[in-house]
């Protein structure tokens, strides 16, 4: 799953035609990337995309450190602002339903860490992260807070042992 992180911010700061150009370029880069991996892309809703490919191409993308993030950052709005995406990847799931759930969790994790990165959730319930080079703009809204709280709650429920401590003792 892929999410166009800063679409609203870029749209707010640009004209309608500029916004359409940026959104189109982001979708084009993602489409070409999916096709280069023998997969395909489908737009889901406002800035969200489903990308399907096979394991060998995911491994190759990981080896290249998901260079698609760099290509997306090359899409500029004005002189200083770049487009960014976050991607959630599932590896080793037993079914398509499980893969979708894992990809959603991975995407939430990438967004929770500031966006502009890829989070890969693997079979042993570990995550691997790529990207995150641009300075993330912290969004403090109710939806984001709820997503982070739900993700944290899921991790606590799935854990056998939970330790909570302050920074001084960690």
Task: Mark where each language-model region is.
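Catalytic-site or vestigial catalytic-site microsegments of nucleotide-handling domains
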Residues: 1-10, 163, 168
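A short glycine-enriched loop-to-beta-strand structural element that forms part of the catalytic core
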Residues: 40-52, 77-105, 116-123
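Catalytic-core segments of nucleotide cyclases and related cyclic-nucleotide turnover enzymes
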Residues: 62, 66-69, 92-115, 138-140
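C-di-GMP signaling machinery
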Residues: 97-98, 122-156
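Alpha-helical scaffold within the catalytic cores of cyclic-nucleotide enzymes
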Residues: 26-38, 59-80, 104, 109
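Pre-Walker A (Motif I) flank of P-loop NTPase domains
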Residues: 159-161
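Conserved long alpha-helical elements within nucleotide-processing catalytic cores of c-di-GMP signaling
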Residues: 5-31, 43, 58-62, 139
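Short helix/loop segment flanking the catalytic signature motif in cyclic-nucleotide metabolism enzymes
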Residues: 22, 50-68, 99
